[in-house]
Regions:
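Gly/Ser/Thr-rich loops at beta-strand to alpha-helix junctions
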Residues: 40-43, 67, 114-124, 145-147
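Glycine-rich phosphate-binding "P-loop"
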Residues: 72-99
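Short, surface-exposed basic-aromatic patches at helix termini and helix-loop junctions that form
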Residues: 106, 125-137, 156-160
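N-terminal extension/subdomain marker
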Residues: 1-46, 50-56, 304-331, 338, ...
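Active-site glycine-rich loop that binds ribose-phosphate moieties when present
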Residues: 89-103, 144-164
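Short, flexible loop segments at boundaries between secondary-structure elements
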Residues: 137-157, 256-266
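Short cysteine clusters
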Residues: 1, 119, 208-211
Length: 361
């Protein structure tokens, strides 16, 4: 569908397209005046606000928090700039975003912007021609894994004795998770010190563990953080995406994304642990006394910037092959695109592992 949306498929030999999909340009970015309550600086929200200010859309379809649970996503059709304020921030869980499209069209919406994660955007693009909208803008955010809101609350309980006071959580590009609390305090936890081994094996469903579209390749513009080295990361994919970015003008600070470190070692280690976990074996873990030291070293010597983003994309590709081979080998040929095999090949995972013959890892 890349060619249908962008006019061409990714070019394996062009820049980083084999990792991130078709794009015109990559940026490291941040709003000069960050929006209060935003997950990062608020670029996604501000683009949507500017669409209303310039009268370019009739509505924005996005997620808002459930009134009874701030972490639970609820689809909303926003009809004004002011309505976007409540939509800032991150939520965790499943919600039928696209269920509001037909009601929106019935209400007379002809020009629509949608803010969504990859699985939502993929379904949207599949329906796009049938919708017959006069204009559709798609602002995508990356997504690595999702879980139910109930399971996410279980995770929060492992991070704090008072999980109900947590108001913000983000996996940062410096190998830390940042948590913010109701009283304004903050806590940063190195990835290696997270209690991931205490999570149930089905915490992330198979559909997420076998998703190969981390970077939301069918959006007009992807707004994330993985390649931003502490700032936000923009993937401008087509002319519509550039039109959206141009709406910010001098409000946004742009620079070329950096890249440092080497990803092969961390990705290989991830592959070995994923194979063990998929086979029901205990994960190999380092001694507890060594974890703080390695957690301190990783932001300094591990992959950073675009190299970190490349590593995450390769990890998702490897994870997809391993889990499909283990649980749904007959689906491998239809669920694994050609470019994924190119990403896994440097790690010894080739099309010979496509499930035509079932083998144990």
């Amino acid at each position: 569908m890349e060619e249908q949306v962008h006019g061409r498929a990714r070019r394996e030999s062009q820049g980083d397209e084999r990792f991130f999909g078709p794009y015109q340009i990559l940026y490291r970015a941040s709003l000069r005046n960050p929006l209060p309550g935003a997950q990062w600086t608020g670029i996604t929200t501000r683009i949507a606000e500017r669409l209303f200010e310039e009268k370019m859309v009739d509505a924005v379809l996005t997620m808002a928090p459930d009134p009874n649970d701030a972490w639970r996503p609820v689809p909303v059709l926003v009809r004004s700039k002011e309505g976007l304020t409540n939509c800032r921030g991150m939520r965790m869980g499943y919600a039928p975003l696209l269920s509001l499209i037909e009601p929106a069209i019935a209400q007379g919406v002809e020009r629509l912007a949608v803010i969504g994660i990859p699985c939502q955007v993929y379904a949207l693009r599949a329906l796009e021609r049938e919708l017959k909208l006069k204009k559709l803008y798609v602002i995508g955010t990356p997504c690595s894994d999702n879980t139910t809101t109930e399971r996410f609350h279980e995770f929060l309980e492992l991070l704090s004795p008072a999980p109900e006071t947590i108001t913000y959580l983000e996996f940062c590009a410096d190998y830390h998770v940042e948590i913010r609390f109701r009283d304004g305090s903050k806590k940063r936890i190195p990835f290696l010190l997270l209690p991931l081994s205490k999570l149930p094996s089905d915490f992330f469903p198979l559909t997420c563990r076998t998703c190969v579209d981390y970077t939301n390749v069918l959006s007009d513009i992807t707004v994330g953080y993985m390649g931003g080295e502490g700032a936000q990361w923009l993937i401008v994919r087509n002319d519509a995406g550039m039109e959206l970015l141009d709406l910010l003008g001098a409000e946004v600070q742009l620079s070329s994304p950096g890249s440092a470190g080497r990803r092969h070692g961390p990705v290989k280690g991830f592959m070995e642990n994923t194979r063990r976990a998929a086979g029901g074996l205990p994960l190999r873990s380092m001694p507890n006394w060594l974890r703080p030291l390695v957690g301190w070293l990783m932001p300094k010597i591990g992959p950073r910037g675009l190299e970190f983003a490349r590593a995450r994309v390769e990890m998702k590709a490897i994870e997809t092959v391993i889990h499909l081979k283990r649980e749904e080998p007959k689906r491998m040929k239809s669920m694994i695109p050609e470019h994924v095999w190119a990403l896994t090949k440097p790690y010894g995972i080739t099309r010979q592992d496509d499930g035509s013959t079932r083998q144990d890892d």
